[in-house]
Amino acid sequence: MENDLSFGEDVMSYEEESDSAFPSPIRPTPPGHSGNYDLEQSRQEEDSNQAIQSIVVHTDPEAYLNLNTNANTRGDAQAYVELNELMGNSWQETGRWVGYEENFNPGTGKWGPSHVSYLTFKSLIQLRKIMSTGAIILDLQASSLSAVAEKVVDELRTKGEIRAADRDGLLRALLQRRSQSEGAVAQPLGGDIEMQTFSVTKQRDTTDSVEASIVLSGVMDSLEKPAVAFVRLGDSVVIEGALEAPVPVRFVFVLVGPSQGGVDYHESGRAMAALMADWVFSLEAYLAPTNKELTNAIADFMDCGIVIPPTEIQDEGMLQPIIDFQKKMLKDRLRPSDTRIIFGGGAKADEADEEPREDPLARTGIPFGGMIKDMKRRYRHYISDFTDALDPQVLAAVIFIYFAALSPAITFGGLLADKTEHMMGVSELMISTCVQGIIFAFIAAQPTLVIGFSGPLLVFEEAFFAFCKSQEIEYIVGRIWVGLWLVIIVVVIVAVEGSFLVKFISRFTQEIFSILISLIFIYETFSKLGKIFKAHPLVLNYEHLNDSLDNPFHPVVKEHIEYHEDGNKTVHEVIHERAYPNTALLSMCLMFGCFFIAYFLRQFKNGHFLPGPIRRMIGDFGVPIAIFFMIAVDITIEDAYTQKLVVPKGLMVSNPNARGWFINPLGEKKPFPAWMMGACCVPALLVFILIFLESQITTLIVSKPERKMVKGSGFHLDLLILVTMGGIASLFGVPWLSAATVRSVTHANALTVMSKGPKPEIEKVLEQRISGMLVAAMVGVSILLEPILKMIPMTALFGIFLYMGITSLSGIQMWDRMLLLIVPRKYYPADAYAQRVTTMKMHLFTLIQMVCLGALWMVKMSAFSLALPFVLILTIPLRMAITGTLFTDKEMKCLDASDGKVKFEEEPGEDMYESPLP
């Protein structure tokens, strides 16, 4: 398909033809066209044309938003464009482009900030008009600007665009000296928004392969009419003195003419420069075999342009529909019809024949087939897993992830000790994290995962401890038999390749569980604070209590007598903890203070104060900073008592009077019931469900194709390693671990290498094992910080739990839809679940999830809390049941579709402690 555009004096006529000798490689599908292209015809046409190198085109639907695709991509090349305008006796550089535009301000002598090019419709019409009559020279063999200039003036003279007497004057003008504008780039107000601090020159100089376009535009009153020439060099060459940097030149565009010619030379020059900076137009210009295809490329560019009527824009928010409309137009623009274009999403041309990406969850039909595939896929890269760690970015990731892993270890350790009466605590959790983390990083198929303790496991430990206590069974011994059954279950699941079941866990189930854990965190925080107020009550006047016999500030000993059948009796003495004045108020201040500091630093991270790297660093370490401040406050207030984190000295267990480092499977203080050894398979199945959910979903998130990891994942092998280590860990009385979603995603993000630009694109991930090993080892060594850890107030950790519970709600679609229940329809977001589904259906879906959430909460608060994972699994068949009955497939795709886009750059209100599964 070709576009034949002819221009009269004041009107543009647009006419499409269907006899194209060279189909545009990227062209919008015309109305009524089915989109079926004759690939065989394209191959025949390709054979008849001159050989053209293979082209690589990004096919990511969001690629047009990124710099690397906004700029020209030919293999590894990017397009760099300079606009030079004739001013007196020299050419002055006034603009430059690498996808985005920078303009030189002669008044200040500085370059302005980068911005999206904006063009007048008149300049495009003028450009199209003069291009239809100008000189177009394709595949010129020249290595100097003088050779190009001579060819241009001769071609213009031959076509009658200039008079013979004008030839020498035009040649002298084209060869005038060039004045490069070397002023500093001006920083815009609010200066560290990524779009504004993007630098064209930095992007140009840091890119390995660049090709340049020179645009020369200016007024020459000696000419009779405007003259235009477009030159495509056969080979890109460095032309000395032509550009401000030694970049190979591929295209040269010349536009000169009289001031009375009816052409705005500045705007027309900017329009041509913007065209050359557009990767689709530049690609078509590179492939065009004749003049007509080049003019058609301009028509294609205009087809995708948007004209804003000359009305006042009172609010920037009014431009949002334009942005959404432009995204749709740009997606429609990517219509490949030329087999010379190799679609690889940024891959090299020689990678076009690579095998399609293997599905790691595909079943082989043989026992342990999935695990064997995981091992073959990953272990062939084992040596590179260590050599790839020789990168400074890995060291930076280790330091960052260490604090990201240490804070939850301390927080969960303190809460675990409180829930289990110190049968397990900080020391056990830190040692477990250290040993299991090192082993996992050393042999796992996906060492990018960070393993650790999590909220769901804490809920299970609390429920299992309460069950054992009610049955007068030794909790720490029962965990051994649960661990043994865990190993048996995981071997069976891995043997039958059961990891494929993760495909059935949709957003419907994930978000219900996510909000449940968040609510548990919030509830437990205020529950603990309430217990402190009860143990240390507030009294209006303390003085009269000094002489009272019922002084609440002294320990109270109460006796409980138990009579036996043989006539003997046992006297139990219960010592109630002494109540302290001001403890409750100080505890509340420490809890909310820790929460608000962490929350403020989270907001500060996405604010405008301080340079971006410093601000983000402070925000990333917000939780440790908040804990440190609360320690300082607690130390300065000496007269008030607060409960501190209990940490044993050295490698001692948390409760040395009740247990040691090795647990006797047959019982520590009394024989373990034989029936319970077999019955432990039930809690083992439940805790396996939790580990399976967290680990497999985390692996699914980290291993998404959009992250461009190349060494494979380990759904089967990693699950076997995790659960087997947990089973062995039970013998030593240390916690089970699972893949921690937040820490794993943060680890992957820290190891990700991004392209430069206002909307960076993932280039690769430094997949290696060293960072995971070092982080785990450093967490283990941190147990030596016992003197410092003992200074942490427990209520400060409650504040962190409140922080984790509240921030984890951010970004959960179910929570957003719950808020929409009280939001007017006109304020609904532009997301598919709110715009493509009726309001009643959307609210019905939300209410179903809320009913499931309520049922799970009732189970959690009842004596059957151990059954929580089983009840959670029941939401999977429920989701299948409502599909096709209450909701159509299209509605479910909008309401329950998984988000395939990787969120690397954190949005406002989002940080490393947020997670779908806290």
Curated annotation (Swiss-Prot):
The keyword Nucleus does not apply. Residues 1-392, 446-448, 496-507, 605-615, 698-713, 751-769, 810-847, 879-918 are cytoplasmic. Glycans are attached at N546, N568. Residues 417-424, 466-474, 531-583, 637-676 are extracellular. GO terms for biological process: bicarbonate transport; regulation of intracellular pH. The gene is slc4a1. It is a multi-pass membrane protein. The keyword Lyase does not apply. This is Band 3 anion exchange protein. It catalyses: hydrogencarbonate(in) + chloride(out) = hydrogencarbonate(out) + chloride(in). The chain crosses the membrane at residues 393-416, 425-445, 449-465, 475-495, 508-530, 584-604, 616-636, 677-697, 714-732, 733-750, 770-790, 791-809. Residues 848-878 dip into the membrane without crossing it. It is found in: Cell membrane. Belongs to the anion exchanger (TC 2.A.31) family. A dimer in solution, it spans the membrane asymmetrically and appears to be tetrameric. Its main location: membrane. Functions both as a transporter that mediates electroneutral anion exchange across the cell membrane and as a structural protein. Major integral membrane glycoprotein of the erythrocyte membrane; required for normal flexibility and stability of the erythrocyte membrane and for normal erythrocyte shape via the interactions of its cytoplasmic domain with cytoskeletal proteins, glycolytic enzymes, and hemoglobin. Functions as a transporter that mediates the 1:1 exchange of inorganic anions across the erythrocyte membrane. A lipid is attached at C852 (S-palmitoyl cysteine). GO terms for cellular component: basolateral plasma membrane; plasma membrane. It holds the Pfam family Band_3_cyto. Residues 1-48 are annotated as: Disordered. PROSITE patterns: ANION_EXCHANGER_1 (PS00219), ANION_EXCHANGER_2 (PS00220).
